[in-house]
């Protein structure tokens, strides 16, 4: 009986003492999470009037373009997110038009 208790206690000690591995696969922090009310393909965006608002070569844009973005923290004040929650860790042109964001699945 004493031997079993010692083994269980030793295993419990090892489980508690083992350090947790730091996950570095996702760098999206709370400041990078945005709620974007509009999302469109880059090709559609290139044809829109909004494309004239950003000072980069339009041909360089690929993937999705998100607009009307606000921080998730702002949702507490009564805003609503009707399209897509994104991580804008490496985003360009924060707010009006966001390029370089990654969609994330967050239940709000």
UniProtKB/Swiss-Prot annotation:
SMART domains: HYDRO (SM00075). GO terms for cellular component: extracellular region; fungal-type cell wall. InterPro entries: Hydrophobin, Hydrophobin_CS. PROSITE patterns: HYDROPHOBIN. Disulfide bonds join 28-87, 35-81, 36-69, 88-101. Pfam families: Hydrophobin. Its main location: secreted. Transmembrane segments: none annotated. The keyword Glycoprotein applies. Induction: Expressed throughout the culture in cell wall extracts, but increased when the aerial development becomes prominent. Expression is impaired by carbon source limitation. Belongs to the fungal hydrophobin family. This is Class I hydrophobin 3. It comes from Pleurotus ostreatus. The gene is vhm33.
């Amino acid at each position: 009986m004493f031997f079993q208790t010692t083994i269980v206690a030793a295993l419990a000690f090892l489980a508690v003492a083992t350090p947790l591995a730091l996950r570095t696969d996702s760098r999206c922090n709370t400041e990078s999470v945005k709620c974007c009310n509009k999302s469109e393909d880059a090709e559609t965006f290139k044809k829109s009037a909004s494309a004239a608002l950003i000072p980069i070569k339009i041909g360089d844009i690929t993937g999705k373009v998100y607009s009307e973005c606000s921080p998730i923290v702002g949702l507490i004040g009564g805003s609503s997110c009707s399209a897509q929650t994104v991580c804008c860790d490496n985003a360009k042109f924060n707010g009006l038009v966001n390029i370089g964001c990654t969609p994330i699945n967050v239940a709000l």
